[in-house]
Amino acid sequence: MKIAILYREEREKEGEFLKEKISKEHEVIEFGEANAPGRVTADLIVVVGGDGTVLKAAKKAADGTPMVGFKAGRLGFLTSYTLDEIDRFLEDLRNWNFREETRWFIQIESELGNHLALNDVTLERDLSGKMVEIEVEVEHHSSMWFFADGVVISTPTGSTAYSLSIGGPIIFPECEVLEISPIAPQFFLTRSVVIPSNFKVVVESQRDINMLVDGVLTGKTKRIEVKKSRRYVRILRPPEYDYVTVIRDKLGYGRRIE
């Protein structure tokens, strides 16, 4: 099997550790930083870092490429193994004993160009700026208006990222939906809405505001169009992986109080 290993900038040592182990059984055809430019073509991409590293690596992968993350960051929603579990991973790899998750991207079109996001796209004011009036038009429906600091449009993958911190719901990865969440809206009852993923969303503000794609500032714009992309990646999990256990352990959600 031809494997690429991509690592977070300061995690080269951990990447070398995995390379040494994996290369005993498989051909490592690429080894480098996840934020380096270019596409990666391999049978499997191994990522060393946290969720941010996985997001960068996913955009370099060909459609449908399986990916597996080794946790070397903080929360690690998108990582599946720890470095101490390398032997367990190699055993699972020999037998292809994984649970697979399909994680799809959204496509964002604006005057800044076309972008892909696995987590979310955000339009928000500068810290020194005033609140903005934002129009959100969902395909086949009339417009919604928010007077807020901004708005986040996220995938199910991104529901445990920025959207969660501003009151959005946790969405299981298998759901085919998009989540629209206003940031600090003027009216308390203005909450997140969840829509079918096949609906296009147009967001327009009164003035140029910041656009962030997966947390990375790309520039200022007034208008974006968001729709589900055909691009996707496959995240490999250990066979016993359970999403509820993950959100309970990492977020404390649904934890029993004794």
Swiss-Prot record:
Alphabetical GO biological process terms: NAD metabolic process; NADP biosynthetic process
Catalytic activity, as annotated: NAD(+) + ATP = ADP + NADP(+) + H(+)
GO molecular function, one term: NAD binding
Subcellular location: Cytoplasm
InterPro entries: ATP-NAD_kinase_N, ATP-NAD_kinase_PpnK-typ_C, NAD/diacylglycerol_kinase_sf, NADK
Cofactor list: a divalent metal cation
Positions of disulphide bridges: none
Residue numbers binding NAD(+): 51-52, 119-120, 130, 149, 160-165, 184
Transmembrane segment boundaries: none
Pfam families, sorted: NAD_kinase (PF01513), NAD_kinase_C (PF20143)
Coiled-coil annotated residue ranges, if any: none
Keyword Acyltransferase: no
Keyword Transport found: no
EC number: 2.7.1.23
Subunit comment: Homodimer.
Family recorded in the similarity comment: Belongs to the NAD kinase family.
NCBIfam families given in the database record: PRK14075.1
Annotated protein name in UniProt: NAD kinase
